[in-house]
């Protein structure tokens, strides 16, 4: 039964819930805030589909190119680039898709900015909600069935998600679908929704107001500052960077509240599951400092469909050919596993009693000397050179 899957394997893609023909699979959220499947034995008809199709128990094969064309890219629209997490390539590809009458499926924040889920949309308003990375797990319950229905009705769909969610969708549908276009990203690992909610709750308490807008990896102090920017209903603003924000400390440096299975991800590999793969072009050489501060995406063109998507958006993109080695120089998580450094179980126990920042501080503290060295390097490289834009 799928409910006996080990926690360090299950990706939480929720595809087994959608594929079960008798509605026997549901999900239980554990104390780490991550969900895992449960099976109602009375409803289960023992067809075995959940196990046969699970992308964590069976690697989903891909015919995509194992040596894809690699580009550095960004949107030519300054606002789109500013509002996006990297260079805004997702927005331009999805906008062109909507303009041709297609549906987009991706991740949005809940109205209180404390959880995230996958939805299907067709308008620019939908696109504005879907753009931007949310660095914690999105709830995908029902999305596989909804996409399947649209495809059966002859509609075109552009799905974007983590590589394991893309693998789950491909496994659910069973064969390559002409009308389905797939996007994924280089994925370090996904975080616990409970940790993220606790992080926002604490900041709301400190600012005595509820959140109106959250931007992770805000460009206000430059792309490389990895800052979180939060606007509150009372008009106040929170803006902290990689050295001062406890979420970034726990995730970027410690992988402290990441889903357990992400330490042994099956999809950090080539060929990719999706038609296009996006990422951050960290460490890119030969671009101006201004461009680096505005954000630069890496794009892998993994298939003919990927090439079609790029062609459709090309008039709104800056695109230059680069190599895989250049990407690997600055992006270890394309192939490398993210290893958790702090004490994860203690962190989640503490989180039940203490504010988020205290739980991070007490279970993960970076060596002070390393931190000091990184901070001085950052100041020398960016702060003195930074331009306002
Ligand atoms: C959890 C996570 C880890 C990542 N790790 C890396 C990394 O190690 N290296 C790297 O180069 N890039 C990483 N990225 C990708 C990077 O942050 C950008 O999303 C990517 O470069 C595309 O940028 P963009 O500006 O074009 O688009 P954006 O506007 O940022 O892209 C938005 C698209 O991403 C999807 N998305 C956003 N959040 C989620 C989510 N929680 N779950 C599923 N789909 C989501 C949305 O549906 C939307 O379609 C990660 C992204 C996420 C969400
Ligand atoms: S990886 Fe996905 S399909 Fe497999 S058990 Fe976990 S939630 Fe279900
Ligand atoms: S690291 Fe792998 S398993 Fe974890 S969310 Fe990303 S693609 Fe899925």
Labelled PLM ranges:
Residues 1-7, 38-42, 244-253:
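Short, intrinsically disordered, charge-biased short linear motifs at domain edges
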Residues 2-9, 15-32, 36-38, 48-66, ...:
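Iron-sulfur cluster-binding cysteine motifs and their immediate structural context
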Residues 8-22, 45-57, 162-168, 257-270:
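Local cysteine-cluster metal-coordination motifs and their immediate loop/turn environment
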Residues 42-153, 327-343, 349-357:
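Flanking helices and flexible, charged tails adjoining ferredoxin-like Fe-S electron-transfer domains
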Residues 85-88, 111, 159-169, 189-191:
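Gly/Ser/Thr-rich loops at beta-strand to alpha-helix junctions
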Residues 100-103, 208-389:
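Long, compositionally biased charged/polar accessory segments in the mid-to-C-terminal portions
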Residues 170-181, 200-205:
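Short, surface-exposed basic-aromatic patches at helix termini and helix-loop junctions that form
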Residues 181-202:
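Short, flexible loop segments at boundaries between secondary-structure elements
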């Amino acid at each position: 039964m799928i409910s006996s899957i080990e926690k360090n394997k299950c990706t939480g893609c929720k595809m087994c819930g959608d594929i079960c023909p008798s509605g026997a699979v549901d999900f239980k959220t554990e104390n780490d805030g991550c969900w895992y499947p449960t099976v109602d034995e009375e409803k289960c008809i023992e067809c075995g589909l959940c196990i046969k199709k699970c992308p964590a128990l069976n690697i989903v094969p891909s015919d995509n190119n194992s040596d894809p064309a690699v580009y550095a890219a960004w949107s030519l629209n300054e606002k789109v680039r500013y509002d996006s997490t990297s260079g805004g390539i997702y927005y331009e590809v999805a906008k062109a898709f909507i303009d041709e009458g297609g549906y987009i499926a991706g991740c949005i924040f809940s109205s209180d900015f404390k959880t995230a889920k996958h939805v299907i949309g067709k308008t620019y308003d939908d696109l504005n909600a879907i753009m931007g990375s949310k660095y914690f797990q999105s709830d995908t319950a029902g999305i596989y069935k909804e996409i399947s229905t649209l495809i059966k009705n002859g509609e075109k769909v552009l799905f974007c998600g983590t590589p394991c969610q893309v693998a789950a969708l491909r496994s659910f549908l069973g064969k390559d679908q002409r009308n389905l276009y797939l996007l994924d990203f280089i994925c370090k690992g996904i975080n616990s929704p409970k940790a993220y909610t606790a992080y926002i709750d604490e900041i709301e308490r400190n600012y005595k107001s509820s959140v109106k807008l959250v931007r992770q990896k805000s460009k206000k102090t430059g792309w490389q500052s990895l800052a979180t920017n939060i606007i509150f209903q009372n008009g106040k603003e929170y803006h902290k960077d990689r050295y001062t924000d406890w979420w970034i400390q726990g995730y970027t440096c410690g992988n402290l509240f990441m889903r357990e299975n992400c330490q042994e991800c099956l999809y950090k590999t080539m060929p990719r599951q999706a038609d296009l793969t996006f990422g951050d072009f960290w460490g890119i050489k030969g671009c101006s400092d201004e461009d680096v501060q505005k954000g630069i995406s890496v794009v892998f063109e993994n298939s003919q469909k990927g090439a079609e998507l790029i062609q459709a958006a090309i008039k709104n993109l800056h695109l230059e050919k680069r190599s895989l080695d250049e990407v690997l120089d600055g992006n270890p998580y394309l192939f490398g596993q993210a290893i958790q450094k702090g004490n994860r179980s203690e962190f989640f126990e503490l989180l039940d009693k203490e504010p988020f920042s205290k739980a991070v501080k007490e279970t993960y503290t970076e060596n002070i000397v390393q931190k000091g060295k990184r901070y001085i390097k950052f100041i020398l490289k960016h702060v003195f050179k930074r331009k306002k834009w």
